[in-house]
Design a protein with these regions (language model features):
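Rossmann-like dinucleotide/phosphate-binding beta-alpha-beta segment
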Residues: 26-98
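Short, charged/polar "capping" segments at the starts of alpha-helices
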Residues: 11-16, 53-57, 137-139
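N-terminal glycine-/charge-rich "phosphate-binding" loop or analogous flexible N-terminal tail
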Residues: 1-25
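Rossmann-like dinucleotide-binding domain for NAD(H)/NADP(H)
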Residues: 99, 109-203
Length: 203
């Protein structure tokens, strides 16, 4: 979706380093906890919100409002439900710190994209990293490189220098695909052998 030079010659703001920043996770399942471990390695303070708290989460659980108010970075790692559609909205953005960073590698409809655009334009949101998009189905899974993007909301996002959009394939590495295949096969073998299912999802 967007080409980024490997080396961008400019003066970087060294006051925005991650150390001692508050990184807030919405969703503390396996992926959220892995991300928390990475952030902890950078010396970040890890806070989390999840209706189903995990004893394996190494950070501190807080309410959603407290998370929004304290966040330097908000990263979404939760499934999409009827209750959390547009979790990031004009209302929740208004509760955030000025300059907050938002990361979404989960589900596009967790974010009201127009509200995100408004927050970015006003400076309330400092930057966004998106591997998913609210209307991605008709845009992300075919090659439109020779066509004009008619989705004005997405076009606005892509044009912003403080936004990175990838087409729901940031995971697409040789190592990740191999791990997915191995885990899937092992899940089948464990199921049919009557073994413990380490990746079981209760519905």
């Amino acid at each position: 979706m967007k080409t980024i030079a490997f080396f961008d010659a400019k003066s970087y703001d060294r006051e925005s380093l991650a150390n001692f920043r508050n990184d807030e996770l919405i969703g503390t399942g396996k992926i959220g906890r892995c991300f928390a471990d990475i952030c902890e390695g950078f010396g970040m303070n890890i806070l989390g919100f999840d209706p189903y708290e995990s004893p394996e989460f190494a950070g501190k659980y807080v309410t959603l409002d407290e998370l929004l108010e304290k966040s330097d970075i908000i990263s979404l790692h939760c499934p999409l439900t009827r209750e959390n559609k547009h979790l990031i909205s004009d209302e929740t953005i208004s509760k955030m710190k000025k300059g907050v960073y938002i990361i979404n590698t989960s589900r596009g409809q967790l974010i009201d994209t127009q509200a995100l655009n408004n927050g970015l334009k006003s400076g309330k949101i400092g930057a966004a990293g998106l591997d998913v998009y609210e209307e991605e189905t008709s845009l992300f899974f075919e090659d439109f490189s020779d066509e004009v993007i008619t989705d004005d909301t997405l076009s606005t996002l892509i044009a912003m220098p403080n936004v990175i959009v990838s087409s729901h394939q940031a995971f697409l590495t040789k190592e990740a695909l191999s791990a997915i295949a191995e885990t899937t096969v092992k899940n089948f073998l464990d199921y049919f052998s009557g073994n413990e299912l380490k990746n079981e999802i209760s519905v």
